[in-house]
Amino acid sequence: MELKSIKKLSLTVNTVILIMVFGLMFFFHLCNVTFLVYFSIPTSMIYVIGYCLIHKNKLNIYVWLVFSWLTFYMGVTTICLGYDYGFHLYCFSMIPTMFVTEYMSYKLNKRSLWAFNVSILIAFFYLICTGYVASFGPVYEVNSKTASAFFWIFNAMTVFGFLIFYSKYLIYSIIKSEEKLSEIAH
């Protein structure tokens, strides 16, 4: 696993997330959820900063920034809009992604990301956000079955797609490492 390939993957993921933030910002505008429109502005800046961190090889800082803000952003959107839009699903994807990233960090001889402890915090945060919605309902009532169905499917497909491709990348990297070790041993 080389730094170059991890940087390329990070740039791709960062670009996809940034595009999604702008798409969500437009959706929030259409639904008159003004708070989330404005909340998307600092969110987009986080991912612009991400490009600088990737460029400067500050991948540990980048990972912490993205994971913490993405988890926070999806928690806020869940509280604002409720379960029907599927934003809470992203918290689930953060947990296995944390462990995959822990492995990548190990392969690059970087510091531990404390995947286990962070995963517990993510689960706790998820329970707080979804518990709030279960107890009090969402902050905004957006009465659009079409929008909620679209976003539930879109968010579920995004989460599953990300998990599948991220896991595939990890397994591919592990296999390549094993093959290199096998070549060296023989």
Show where each model-derived region lies.
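Cleavable Sec-type N-terminal signal peptides
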Residues: 16-20, 72, 121, 125, ...
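Hydrophobic, aromatic-rich alpha-helical transmembrane segments
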Residues: 7, 33-37, 145, 149, ...
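Short, Lys/Arg-rich, polar N-terminal cytosolic tail immediately upstream
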Residues: 1-4
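Membrane-interface elements of multi-pass transporters and channels
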Residues: 33, 56-57, 83-84, 132-140, ...
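Hydrophobic transmembrane alpha-helices
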Residues: 46-47, 66-91, 95-98, 105-152
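Hydrophobic transmembrane alpha-helices and their membrane-interface boundaries in multi-pass
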Residues: 7-83, 91-98, 117
